[in-house]
Each structure stands twice: as structure tokens, then as C-alpha cells.
Amino acid sequence: MDGYRPGLLDRLLGGPPGARFLSQEQVKDSLARDLEVLLNTRTALPQYLLQGYPECAASILNFGLADFAGLSQSGSEDRARICSSVRQAVERHEPRLRNVEVSLAETPGTVNRIDIVISGMLWPHGANEAVSFSAALQPSSLHYSIKRGGIA
């Protein structure tokens, strides 16, 4: 095989003309873009409404994250809740990433910014490579930016 087949979103959006396969680096770039979309989407329903409906909880209906506006990065319970929510969303909606781990990183010199590190194993078509992505939430815009590797 000459590469990896593009994901559904890439095929629907009509990626580069004539590109039937992606390199491993292109897969990582695609994964970073899709993680950014996931983190910048807010769920429509609160989690407690979906507890009795596991199929709905794992569906596109539950795509995205809950709003963290009322949580504090300095509180250990809130930090754990943010990490758990991000990990669950990634595990639920990103099949190319396995063994997902999420942690909050503290970046010296930043105020009111949440930095999240998402790591796991890249898993398209049998590839097995450790990857990490950094997400930075800018409170003024409430927008996450994602980059591969270090702090965004």
C-alpha cells in the first residue's frame, strides 16, 4: 500500500485532487485538524440526559465538549473533570487514536489560558506510533488551537 486512506471527512470535503492515499504525516495533520474541530464544538445536551442511552452518548449527537466556562484550572476536581471530558470525547469520536491520555499543562507566563496535552497511539490501518497534540484554549475567544507535539 502507498499510504493511508483519508478519513471520511477528508473524502467528503474532497481533499487534494487525485490524492487517494495520505502519508503518515498527512494523517497526523488531519488528526490534529479533526481534534481541533472536536474541541471547538460544544455538545447540545448535558451528559446526565444521556446516561440512560449509551447509543446516543456514543453518537454524533454527543459530538464535542461540555462548556468549561465555570471551571477553574487551579482546582484539582475541575482539572480532573476537564481532562476526563476531553479524553472521553476523543475516545468516542476519534478512532485513529488509541490509549488516549489527557493532562493539563501549566505554561509559565500565561494567564487565563488552558493548555491540554492529548497523547495516544496512532492507529490507522495497523500503524502503531505514539503521538501527542497540544491544545491551548484562549479564554477571550473560547477557541482551542491544536498543534502536534509541544504546547500550542
Give each language-model segment a name.
Residues 59-61, 110-115:
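A short, glycine/Asx- and small/polar-enriched loop/turn
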Residues 107-109, 122-123:
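Short acidic/polar capping segments at secondary-structure boundaries
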Residues 100, 116-118, 131-133:
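Hydrophobic residues positioned within well-ordered beta-strands of beta-sheet architectures
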